[in-house]
């Protein structure tokens, strides 16, 4: 598994700076924690001090750094973080190596369509009737795959993932532990005759397109009718709630603890920061950016950043926030002016009284 410098150059497309004796790379680590045999990277100028003191054997660096401390080998790349990720993938192969087979404790319905020599079904996993699983897919311990679910190739489901009946999962989809795909949408209707809430049946499905990543304990509800869709390449963080009939576009990122109410439409390449709330039956345009804790109560155009609750353009929200911070001083100044005005009014009244006498 060790890499030579030539191996690193080949994997990253980088250029070796200066002449460096041949070294062996045995692992990856941060600049501050790396030791001999490790390779690290400088992807942010905030870590330049760590770069100056790192004990790594090699470092991936951006072009034209002002200085290169003695010690490590330096490999220049356009994007150190992206290049480093390629090296991490190489070393992770040994940890995440795919081993096909069905564990003896797994329960696989005889009508399930899969090749036991090309898929991995972990301990205590349950594969129900009519499920289809593509080659190269790894179903982790304790997962439950409901009736009629279709799963593509090269997917990775970690422990205790639940995919309920008839949902469709594309190729190369990664789902972290505890996520639930296809739970019932939050649909209830108050019955005026009984004074109780009746459950509205949720008969649709969830579709996760190719290369989607779903974080731990995230829940994506099935549609009332039709489909809840997560578009190709989108990445959803931990503890996110996606309501029924939502449509998330391609390559959109949603950070932790955010939630979208039912029938929300989110465009392509949208960035949603942590703890954002989106009301139902609205849309967010392509390439919009929603700052943390933004509250979206009406539809938003794409191509700009938003902040606040209710959401407004980030520049306007920043001005509002700045104005609010000035309110205590403004109030103090107002009270001083009010006091002076009262004093002036008293003097005027006194002067007028003197003239009358």
Residue ranges, per PLM feature:
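Terminal amphipathic alpha-helical/low-complexity segments used for targeting or macromolecular assembly
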Residues: 1-105, 172, 178-179, 184-199, ...
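Structural signal for interior beta-strand "rungs" in well-ordered beta-sheet cores
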Residues: 41, 101-313
């Amino acid at each position: 598994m060790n890499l030579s410098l030539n191996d690193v150059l080949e994997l990253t497309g980088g250029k070796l700076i200066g002449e460096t004796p041949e070294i062996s790379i045995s692992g990856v680590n941060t600049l501050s924690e790396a030791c001999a045999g490790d390779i690290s990277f400088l992807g942010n100028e905030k870590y330049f001090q760590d770069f100056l003191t790192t004990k790594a054997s090699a470092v991936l660096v951006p072009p034209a750094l002002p200085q290169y401390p003695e010690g490590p080998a330096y490999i220049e790349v356009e994007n150190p973080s992206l290049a480093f990720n390629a090296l991490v993938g190489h070393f992770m192969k040994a940890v995440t190596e795919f081993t096909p087979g069905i564990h003896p404790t797994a329960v696989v319905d005889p009508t399930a369509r899969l090749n036991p020599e090309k898929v991995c079904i972990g301990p205590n996993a349950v594969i129900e009737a009519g499920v289809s699983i593509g080659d190269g897919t790894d179903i982790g311990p304790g997962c439950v795959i409901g009736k009629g679910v279709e799963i593509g190739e090269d997917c990775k489901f970690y422990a205790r993932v639940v995919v309920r009946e008839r949902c469709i999962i594309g190729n190369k989809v990664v789902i972290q532990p505890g996520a639930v795909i296809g739970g019932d949408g939050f649909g209830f209707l108050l019955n005026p005759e009984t004074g109780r809430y009746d459950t509205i049946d949720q008969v649709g499905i969830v579709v996760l397109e190719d290369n989607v990543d779903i974080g731990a304990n995230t829940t994506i509800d099935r549609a009332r009718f039709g489909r809840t869709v997560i578009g190709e390449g989108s990445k959803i963080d931990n503890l996110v709630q996606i309501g029924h009939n939502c449509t998330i576009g391609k390559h959109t990122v949603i950070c932790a603890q955010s939630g979208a109410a039912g029938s929300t439409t989110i465009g392509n390449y949208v960035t949603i920061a942590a703890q954002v709330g989106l009301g139902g039956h609205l849309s967010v345009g392509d390439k919009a950016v929603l700052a943390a804790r933004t509250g979206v109560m009406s539809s938003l155009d794409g191509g700009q950043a938003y902040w606040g609750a209710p959401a407004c353009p980030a520049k306007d929200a920043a001005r509002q926030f700045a104005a609010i911070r000035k309110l205590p001083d403004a109030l103090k100044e107002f009270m001083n002016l009010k006091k002076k005005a009262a004093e002036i009014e008293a003097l005027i009244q006194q002067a007028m009284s003197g003239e009358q006498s």
